[in-house]
Amino acid sequence: MDTLPLDGRASVLLAGVDEVGRGPLAGAVVAAAVILDPDRPIAGLRDSKRLSAARRSELDRRIRAQALAVSLGRAEVAEIDRLNILQASMLAMQRAVAGLDPAPVQALVDGNRAPALPCPAQAIVKGDDRVPAIAAASILAKQARDAEMRALAEQYPGYGFERHMGYPTTEHLQALRTLGACPAHRRSFAPVRRCLLG
């Protein structure tokens, strides 16, 4: 993994920030913020989408055990529908960073846009492949959101949330047509809105 050069205090209290769940039709957007310990590097950190479930689970445990600070933030379905998915994602990331203790001196955020934060923040395209702290955040966020979607699958059976995690797969779209929308669905997303309009 290429790492971006940092120096001084920022390298110690640098938060990596990422979110998961912008594209799904159901469930919250979950963000994570992580401050890694530079004296305890964690091998194998990379974009969560490129890791097996078993490897993500193992790294999730190691990150939580070795990081200086970790925090999760979320934006609920009602907030996504009220704000829009971009603003809800920014809100989830702000909440994740606000939960860090100690507070970061700098934040590096995956993507092309960073939320307004109480510390300097820089957006980094493909940051989850370039910055270990962002990769760590992507792993924690994905693990947390996947667990939430498995719980929603038990609460709302028949949609297959445990398999597609709310993304608009053929299975999910068919279930929407057959069962209609459940409270976990994002009403502002076109496929759900079409279903509600009949």
UniProtKB/Swiss-Prot annotation:
* Co-factor remark: Manganese or magnesium. Binds 1 divalent metal ion per monomer in the absence of substrate. May bind a second metal ion after substrate binding.
Q: Which domain of life is it from?
A: Bacteria
Matching SUPFAM superfamilies, A to Z? Ribonuclease H-like (SSF53098)
Gene Ontology annotations for the cellular component aspect, listed alphabetically: cytoplasm; ribonuclease H2 complex
Look at the named UniProt entry and state the broad enzyme category this protein falls under: hydrolase
Listed A to Z, the keywords are: Cytoplasm, Endonuclease, Hydrolase, Manganese, Metal-binding, Nuclease
Q: Where does a divalent metal cation bind?
A: 18-19, 110
**What function does the entry list?**
Endonuclease that specifically degrades the RNA of RNA-DNA hybrids.
HAMAP family the UniProt entry points to: RNase_HII_B
Q: Any idea what this protein is called?
A: Ribonuclease HII
Q: Which organism's genome codes for this protein? A: Alkalilimnicola ehrlichii (strain ATCC BAA-1101 / DSM 17681 / MLHE-1)
